[in-house]
Amino acid sequence: MKRYMNAALLYALLAMAGGVFYREFTKFTGFTAKTTLSVVHAHYFLLGMVFFLLLLMLEKTFSFTGTKTGRVLAVYHIGLNLTAAMFVVRGIAQVLGFALSAGLNAAISGFAGIGHLLLGASMILILLRIRHSILPAKS
């Protein structure tokens, strides 16, 4: 359970840092248009902090954590951080007005997509693990 609490705390800090960076970076550059930097804060709060706080409560109630859960959570962490990193990369490019080549634009989108896939697949596996611990075993 300590692992879930530590992860929630880490993602809360990353969410706040992402929000402050978005606000200060856009203010410093005078940028007023829409940018993907604005979603880093929400993604880290909801998919990071809130998700791990929910896992903490579910673990306390149902004790679903097993040997494979750590590996699935590692994939979840990789997926969330890869997604957020690509939001930051694209957002900085938007704010600074970089003209991305077609290849670089596709690479950023591709890595963000891989992050989303890892995030989604690991979330489903965690939910199945929780479901397995809640439902009675079939005889």
Regions found by a protein language model. Give the residues of each.
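Hydrophobic alpha-helical transmembrane segments of multi-pass integral membrane proteins
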Residues: 1-139
